[in-house]
C-alpha cells in the first residue's frame, strides 16, 4: 500500500463512520460498466462541498489492491450488484489529490515532476524488474509495465483543476500540466494501460479554442451530468428520508437548499443538508467554503447586461445564458454568459437545460450573493436596494400613490420599449421591484401561468418575520383598473400559494395605461 499507488481505504472509512452517510455506491455500478471502454474516461465536476473527495475515496477503497474492503461495502448498494466481488480490490489504482500535492511538491510549478517522481518510485517497488532506474516519464512507465505484464491501471485525480483555477496567470505551469494529462490519457498507447480514468474538480476539462484539451473524456457537470446525475449531490428522495429521521420539515428544507435541476433529479448541496440535520438551524452553510473574493470580481466585470442580469436573478427571475463559449478556465471571459457559466460551475447559479437559463437556486445562495455584494459595496445594487426597500415600506404602509410612482420608474428603466407591454416583462418588473423583500420573504411565487395578460406574485413572509410583515399579493396589468385588479385577486381567493397561510394579508392591484404609461395602485388589507 503506497501513498499514490494502491492506497488504502482509511479515507472512505471516515465518511462511513460519520453520523450521516448517504449511500452513493451505485456510482460504482456505472464505473464497472464503462471500465476498459471508450466511455471509461470521466471528468465529473461539481461545486465545493458536493462530495467530490468522498467519491474519489470511495472509488479507491473499492478498486485498490492495497486494501480489503468487502466488509466496508457490505450492506451498501454496490454489494447487491452481480459483479460486486469481480471488481472489488482487483486493480492497481493511482490516486492523486492535486491540492494536497501542492505543498510537498514545493509549489505549482513542481506538481508534474513531483507526482511523476513519487509515483514512479512506488511503481518500482511493485514492478522492480520492469522499470529501469533512469525512467522519468510516468506515462512511459505505465506503458512498459503494461507491455511486460498486461497490467492496466485505474487513475483517480481529485481536484484535477486546481492549477487551472488557482494558477490562471502561470501559463507555463498550466501548459506543462495539460501536456502531462494528454500524455497520460490521449492516444492509442494510453488505451492499453488505462482501465478507468476518473477526474473530479470544479471545472470541466479546459477547452482550447472550442475543443476540449482532453477530448476523449466525457464531461459530467452542473450543466449536464447524464447517467451520474443522482450521484452529484443529495437527491430529493434522500433528503426526504433524512427529514424523517431528524424531524425537519421537507418543504422548508426544499426552500432553503433545493434548486439544482440536473436531468430528472432535484439535487441538494450535501454539506448544507448534513449541517442542517446535525445543527437544526436553517441558515447559510456556504460561507465556510466559499470565497467572496472570487464572486465579487466576477459580477463586477464590465460586460454588457451582467449587472442587470445579477439583479434580475437576485429578485427571483431566470435569465438566458449561452453556456457553450466558456473555455473552462478563470481568465478567458469574453462576455456575461461566460461569467454566468462559471458561476453555475461554482454552484452560485443553477442551470435550466430545457430553457437555457440561469437562476439562483435557493434561499441559501441568494443570501450569500446579497451578503457578498454588500461587503464589497456593489454600488449599483446598494442604490437599487434602497429604492426597493422604500417600495416595500410604502406597500406595507398602503401608500398606493408612492407604490405606483416607484413601479412606473422601474418599469421604465428596466424594460425596453419593445418589451414594455410584454407579459414576461411585467413579471420581471414586479420581481425586480420587490428585490429587498428577499430579506423578509421567501422567493415570490407566480400564482397563475403566462398567457392571461397580467403578472401576479405572492410573497410569503419567512417564519421569523410573520409577526412583523404581512403576506403580499401583487398584481400588475394594463388598460384595466387598479380596483379591478384587486377584485380579480379576491375572485381567485388569493390563490393556492396562500392556502396554508394564516395572518395579515395585503392585496396590491397595479394598473397602467399602455398609451400614457401612467401607473395607478390600490392596496387593501385583509385577514386570512
Model-derived regions: residue spans:
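Phosphate-binding site recognition
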Residues: 1-422, 437-441, 445
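Mg2+/Mn2+-dependent nuclease catalytic core
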Residues: 174-180, 478-495
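Structural motif
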Residues: 154, 470-474, 506
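Conserved catalytic cores of phosphodiester-cleaving nucleases, focusing on short active-site segments
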Residues: 430, 455-461, 469-480, 492
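Catalytic centers of nucleases
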Residues: 444-464
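Metal-dependent nuclease catalytic cores in nucleic-acid-processing enzymes
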Residues: 184-191, 341-349, 431-436, 488-508
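Feature representing long, continuous alpha-helical segments
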Residues: 424, 428, 432, 455-457, ...
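Domain-level recognition of nuclease-like catalytic cores that cleave nucleotide substrates
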Residues: 497, 501-528
Amino acid at each position: 500500500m503506497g501513498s499514490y499507488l494502491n492506497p488504502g481505504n482509511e479515507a472512505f472509512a471516515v465518511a462511513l463512520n460519520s453520523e450521516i452517510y448517504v449511500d452513493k455506491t451505485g456510482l460504482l455500478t456505472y464505473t464497472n460498466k464503462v471500465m476498459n471502454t471508450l466511455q471509461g474516461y470521466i471528468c465529473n465536476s461539481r461545486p465545493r462541498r458536493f462530495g467530490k473527495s468522498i467519491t474519489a475515496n470511495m472509488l479507491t477503497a473499492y478498486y485498490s489492491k492495497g486494501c480489503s474492503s468487502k466488509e466496508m461495502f457490505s450492506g451498501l448498494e454496490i454489494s447487491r450488484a452481480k459483479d460486486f466481488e469481480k471488481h472489488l480490490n482487483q486493480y492497481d489504482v493511482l490516486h492523486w489529490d492535486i491540492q494536497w500535492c501542492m505543498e510537498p511538491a514545493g509549489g505549482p510549478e513542481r506538481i508534474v515532476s513531483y507526482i511523476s517522481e513519487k509515483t514512479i518510485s512506488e511503481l518500482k517497488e511493485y514492478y522492480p524488474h520492469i522499470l529501469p532506474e533512469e525512467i522519468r516519464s510516468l506515462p512511459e512507465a505505465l506503458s512498459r509495465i503494461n507491455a511486460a505484464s498486461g497490467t492496466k491501471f485505474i487513475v483517480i485525480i481529485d481536484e484535477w483543476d486546481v492549477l487551472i483555477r488557482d494558477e490562471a496567470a502561470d501559463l507555463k505551469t498550466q501548459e506543462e500540466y495539460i501536456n502531462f494529462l494528454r500524455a497520460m490519457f490521449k492516444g492509442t498507447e494510453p488505451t492499453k494501460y488505462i482501465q478507468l480514468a476518473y477526474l473530479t474538480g470544479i471545472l470541466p476539462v479546459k477547452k482550447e479554442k472550442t475543443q476540449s484539451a482532453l477530448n476523449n473524456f466525457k464531461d459530467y457537470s452542473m450543466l449536464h451530468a447524464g447517467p451520474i446525475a443522482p450521484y452529484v449531490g443529495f437527491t430529493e428522495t434522500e433528503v426526504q428520508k433524512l427529514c424523517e429521521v431528524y424531524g425537519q420539515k421537507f418543504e422548508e428544507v426544499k426552500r432553503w437548499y433545493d434548486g439544482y435541476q440536473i436531468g430528472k433529479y432535484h439535487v441538494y448541496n450535501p454539506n448544507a443538508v448534513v449541517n442542517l440535520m446535525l445543527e437544526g438551524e436553517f441558515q447559510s452553510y456556504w460561507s465556510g467554503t466559499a470565497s467572496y473574493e472570487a464572486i465579487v470580481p466576477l459580477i463586477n466585470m464590465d460586460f454588457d447586461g451582467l449587472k442587470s442580469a445579477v439583479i434580475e436573478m437576485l429578485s427571483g427571475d431566470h435569465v438566458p445564458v449561452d453556456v457553450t463559449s466558456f473555455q473552462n478556465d478563470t481568465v478567458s471571459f469574453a462576455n456575461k454568459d461566460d461569467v454566468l457559466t462559471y458561476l453555475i460551475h461554482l454552484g452560485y447559479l443553477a442551470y435550466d437545460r430545457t430553457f437555457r437559463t440561469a437562476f439562483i437556486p435557493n434561499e441559501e445562495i441568494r443570501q450569500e450573493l446579497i451578503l457578498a455584494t454588500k461587503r464589497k459595496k456593489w454600488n449599483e445594487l446598494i442604490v437599487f436596494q434602497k429604492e426597493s426597500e422604500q417600495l416595500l415600506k410604502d406597500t406595507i404602509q398602503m401608500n398606493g400613490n408612492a407604490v405606483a410612482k416607484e413601479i412606473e420608474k422601474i418599469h421604465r428603466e428596466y424594460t425596453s420599449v419593445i418589451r414594455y407591454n410584454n407579459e414576461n416583462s411585467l413579471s420581471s418588473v414586479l420581481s425586480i421591484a420587490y428585490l429587498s423583500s428577499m430579506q423578509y420573504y421567501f422567493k415570490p411565487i407566480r400564482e397563475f401561468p403566462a398567457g392571461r395578460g397580467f403578472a401576479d406574485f405572492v410573497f410569503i413572509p419567512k417564519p421569523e418575520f410573520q409577526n412583523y410583515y404581512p403576506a403580499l399579493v401583487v398584481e400588475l396589468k394594463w388598460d384595466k383598473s387598479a380596483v379591478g385588479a384587486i377584485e380579480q385577486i379576491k375572485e381567485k381567493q388569493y390563490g393556492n400559494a396562500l392556502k396554508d397561510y394564516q395572518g395579515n394579508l395585503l392585496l396590491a392591484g397595479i394598473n397602467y395605461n399602455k398609451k400614457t404609461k401612467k401607473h395607478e395602485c390600490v392596496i387593501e388589507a385583509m385577514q386570512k
